[in-house]
Amino acid sequence: MYELIQAKGGSYYIESPAKVGLVQLGGDRVCLIDSGSDKDAGRKVRQHLDANGWHLTAIYNTHSNADHIGGNQYLQKQTGCAIYAPGMEQCVTCHTVLEPSLLYGGCPPKALRNKFLMAQESQAQLLTAEVLPEGWELLPLPGHFLDMVGFRTGDNVVYLADCLASRETLDKYGIAFLYDVGAYLETLERVKTMEAALFVPSHAAAAEHIAPLAQYNIDRTQEAAERIAGLCTGVTFDEVLAGVFKAYGLVMSLPQYALLGSTVKSYLSYLMDRGEVAAEAEDCRLIWRRV
């Protein structure tokens, strides 16, 4: 774990629970794509920098989930590097309580204000194509989270962030966290057509060909949508959520309630907007039915 692996040319990644990209910029200058899950991950990254005599100039965050920005604060304090995050992700990176607030749907209790859902705050600037290193391409990858992006480096290495879950993860859990199901499916259709020297997803193995895994994610997402639609039998949201937990053999906890609850609501929004389910008020309860 935390091994530095060369993808191609000056494009590397650090093998970790959420992969960290590292790209040489010329001379001793390097930048990162994301920073890992916490301060300890930041220290592991710093060890690679020191061992190679590299100077960190910037961190380009793909999105603001805690496991991708957790090393930001430590590395920024240690190196003075700039940090960039896209769109609404910039706000969450600077004000990290927004992530558990969004997931929970209100002021989050202390039990949700932990490093898994709420990273340390860092000073991030808005990420645009203009601030990227020369030869890079900014790749919009919405769906998993608010304004997630990926990057294509000058070595033709594509860093795909969280737009793909591994087969192992999907086979084990059946359903993955999503913010916007429709945008996610559209993103995966675009990813299927991409070509690169190497694709580096954050939570799946690096691969030269990404289309098979993208299609597997599409299939499992559509299966989850159909399963959730089938649970809408004139029941409340909590009953739908309980049905999802039971169907996938998951264990209820407060963090899982926030993560999966948010995901199920996103699926319900997707299904409602497609006219496949409807919500009606009955006896002071909101009831979900398949149309």
Per-segment meaning from a language model:
Residues 1-52, 150-162:
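Conserved beta-strand hairpin/beta-sheet module of binuclear metal-dependent hydrolase folds
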Residues 10, 23, 34, 49, ...:
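Divalent metal-coordination and catalytic microenvironments
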Residues 11, 40-132:
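Active-site HxH/HxHxD metal-binding segment of metal-dependent hydrolases
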Residues 14-16, 132, 141-145:
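A short catalytic or substrate-binding loop motif that flags glycine-/basic-rich loops and adjacent residues
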Residues 37, 137-223:
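Metallo-beta-lactamase
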Residues 227-291:
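C-terminal regulatory/interaction regions
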